[in-house]
């Protein structure tokens, strides 16, 4: 079973590899080469009026056919395929993840006799239901036709629960471009209130550097006392926030940013997180200090957020997806 899937977000693409390869027994390929853009199939970034994202994601280089490895998951091969090569293969599914690619990928699916799948992981992502996709929704977006709401899977061995005794007095963030967000000002204001803690700000543009591999991220999370995850616009699915929960480290941030979103259940003030909206910044800092000093209380919070994560049943969701793909799940 061959599956064609665009790749614009490494966590989402990896989750689709786990689904279509590990669970469903197929092989996932991703487009490579500018021909995909020239032929009108790949349109991600066309709103910029040029092909900058096509050159970033499609140009030959790191994703040569059959030999590339994901820099974030270096053990996982990425099978790149040119347009000419793709036209010569049989396809079961053609999967678009970028909003701009849905029309072109639907066209390619029709041409090769494949089923068209749309995997949605971003907030407020537009779905053209007139294309009649089989929709895998891992955000708050409404489902109006054939689709299921699921959580994006990630490697449970890498992000397995880690004993709270491994944690050190470090508060870390892995939010990309955090410095440009309004919530970052609160984080900076909190730093002098907690001199006994070290703060690590990672991710793209992070002052402490971007961490490339997920294994390194998991190791740093395990050695952290808390995950600082405060994003005014929340997340579609939210790989980082679910990684924190899987490893078992309490969150710091605003619950209100996640109301109605996939990660809402991870925000329970005093149980799984410190909700900055419920008290002053000074009182929040004092609460963080008190929780860290009270090891049984801290352990209980680590266990509580892990227990909340364990409510996700990836096996059951995979069977829902299988039913959707095979046609036994009716439209919403």
Descriptions of predicted regions:
Residues 1-107, 111-112, 276, 314-332:
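N-terminal pre-catalytic "stem/leader" segment of glycosyltransferase-like enzymes
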Residues 5-9, 33, 95-101, 119-123, ...:
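Structural motif
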Residues 117-162:
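Donor nucleotide-sugar binding/catalytic pocket of nucleotide-sugar-dependent glycosyltransferases
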Residues 152-217, 240:
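Conserved catalytic-core segment of nucleotide-activated headgroup transferases in glycan assembly
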Residues 219-236, 249:
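Acidic donor-binding loop of glycosyltransferase active sites
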Residues 229-242, 253-265:
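Nucleotide-sugar-dependent
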Residues 279-282, 292-329:
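A charged, aromatic-enriched C-terminal amphipathic alpha-helix characteristic of glycosyltransferases
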């Amino acid at each position: 079973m061959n599956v064609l899937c665009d790749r614009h977000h490494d966590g989402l693409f990896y989750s689709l590899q786990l689904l279509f390869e590990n669970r469903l027994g197929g092989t996932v390929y991703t487009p490579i080469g500018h021909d995909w853009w020239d032929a009108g199939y790949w349109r991600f970034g066309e709103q910029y009026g040029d092909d900058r994202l096509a050159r970033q994601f499609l140009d030959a280089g790191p994703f040569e056919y059959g030999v590339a490895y994901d820099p974030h998951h270096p053990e996982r091969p990425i099978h790149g395929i040119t347009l000419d090569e793709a036209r010569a293969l049989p396809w079961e599914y053609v999967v678009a993840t970028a909003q701009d690619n849905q029309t072109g990928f639907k066209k390619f699916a029709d041409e090769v006799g494949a089923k068209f799948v749309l995997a949605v992981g971003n907030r407020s992502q537009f779905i053209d239901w007139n294309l009649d996709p089989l929709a895998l929704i891992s955000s708050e977006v409404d489902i109006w036709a054939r689709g299921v709401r699921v959580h994006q899977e990630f490697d449970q061995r890498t992000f397995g629960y880690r004993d709270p005794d491994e944690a050190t007095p470090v508060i870390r963030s892995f939010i990309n471009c955090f410095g440009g967000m309004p919530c970052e000002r609160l984080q900076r204001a909190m730093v002098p209130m907690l001199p006994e803690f070290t703060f690590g700000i990672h991710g793209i543009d992070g002052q402490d550097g971007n961490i490339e591999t997920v294994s390194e991220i998991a190791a740093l999370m395990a050695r952290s006392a808390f995950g600082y995850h405060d994003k005014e616009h929340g997340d579609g699915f939210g790989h980082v926030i679910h990684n924190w929960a899987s490893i078992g480290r309490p969150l710091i941030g605003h619950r209100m940013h996640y109301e109605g979103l996939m990660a809402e259940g991870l925000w329970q003030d005093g149980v799984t997180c410190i909700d900055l909206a419920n008290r002053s910044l000074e009182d929040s800092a004092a609460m963080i200090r008190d929780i860290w000093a009270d090891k049984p209380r801290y352990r209980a919070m680590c266990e509580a957020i892990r227990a909340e994560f364990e409510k996700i049943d990836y096996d059951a969701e995979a069977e829902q997806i299988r039913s959707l793909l095979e046609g036994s799940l009716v439209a919403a």
